[in-house]
């Protein structure tokens, strides 16, 4: 996927010391304030994945939803939600993950993933790779196969891609 850092960088807010001291937070919600930029992002992801064999899109709470939901509509594919612990009402698979700034647990409904389905996994940012790695494990435990992973932003210096080396990983914006 072509690197679009220069273009999208002007629309991404950077907030120092959030959510804790020493962390630089990349806020993609500012992209939503520019419909033409948001539309461009969705169209670029669509043009890259439209011809790949994908059966469903799985999204990581919550900013992954901002990319995955409009993309699933455009591609006419089911949308599988990966949520934080305790947010899903039916029986779930659960997995612990490590963040850039702590630990957490994510879940997916056991019956939302079809056996052997090819899944495009989406999140807004790739930092340590902990959330995405746990999400991929979760989806595979549910019977799916993670075919591709897409992140709008990749923090290359943290090297999260290394923890995802068994997956195809793509990003539009890369910060060093």
From Swiss-Prot:
Gene Ontology terms: biological process:
adenine salvage; AMP salvage; purine ribonucleoside salvage
Catalytic activity of the protein: AMP + diphosphate = 5-phospho-alpha-D-ribose 1-diphosphate + adenine
Gene Ontology CC entries for this record: cytoplasm
Its Enzyme Commission number(s) read: 2.4.2.7
Q: Is Nuclease among this UniProt entry's keywords?
A: no
Tell me the InterPro entries matching this sequence: Ade_phspho_trans, PRibTrfase_dom, PRTase-like, UPRTase/APRTase
Give the Gene Ontology MF terms in alphabetical order: adenine binding; adenine phosphoribosyltransferase activity; AMP binding
Task: Give the subcellular location.
Answer: Cytoplasm
Q: What domain of life is recorded for the organism?
A: Bacteria
Q: Which CDD domains match?
A: PRTases_typeI (cd06223)
The pathway entry for this protein reads as:
Purine metabolism; AMP biosynthesis via salvage pathway; AMP from adenine: step 1/1
Q: Which UniProt keywords apply?
A: Cytoplasm, Glycosyltransferase, Purine salvage, Transferase
Q: What class of enzyme is it?
A: transferase
Establish whether keyword Glycosyltransferase is in the entry. yes
One family from Pfam that matches here is Pribosyltran
- Which family does the record claim for this protein? Belongs to the purine/pyrimidine phosphoribosyltransferase family.
PANTHER family xref list: ADENINE PHOSPHORIBOSYLTRANSFERASE (PTHR32315:SF3)
Task: Name the HAMAP family for this protein.
Answer: Aden_phosphoribosyltr
Record's subunit section: Homodimer.
What task does this protein carry out? Catalyzes a salvage reaction resulting in the formation of AMP, that is energically less costly than de novo synthesis.
Q: Write down what this protein is called.
A: Adenine phosphoribosyltransferase
- State the organism of origin: Borreliella burgdorferi (strain ZS7) (Borrelia burgdorferi)
Q: What is the lineage of its organism?
A: Bacteria, Pseudomonadati, Spirochaetota, Spirochaetia, Spirochaetales
Annotated gene:
apt
């Amino acid at each position: 996927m072509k690197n679009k850092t220069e273009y999208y960088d002007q629309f991404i807010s950077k907030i120092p010391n959030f959510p804790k001291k020493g962390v630089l937070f990349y806020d993609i919600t500012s992209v939503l304030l520019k419909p033409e930029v948001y539309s461009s992002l969705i169209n670029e992801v669509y043009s890259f994945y439209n011809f790949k064999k994908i059966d469903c899109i799985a999204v990581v709470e919550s900013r992954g939803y901002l990319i995955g939901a409009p993309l699933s509509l455009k591609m006419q594919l089911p949308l599988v939600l990966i949520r934080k612990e305790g947010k899903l009402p039916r029986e779930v698979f659960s997995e612990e993950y490590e963040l850039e700034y702590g630990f957490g647990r994510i879940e997916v409904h056991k019956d939302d993933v079809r056996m052997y389905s090819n899944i495009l996994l989406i999140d807004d940012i790739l930092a340590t790779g902990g959330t995405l790695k746990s999400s991929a494990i979760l989806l595979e435990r549910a019977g799916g196969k993670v075919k591709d992973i897409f992140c709008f932003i990749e923090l290359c210096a943290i090297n999260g891609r290394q923890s995802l080396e068994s997956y195809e990983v793509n990003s539009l914006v890369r910060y060093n």
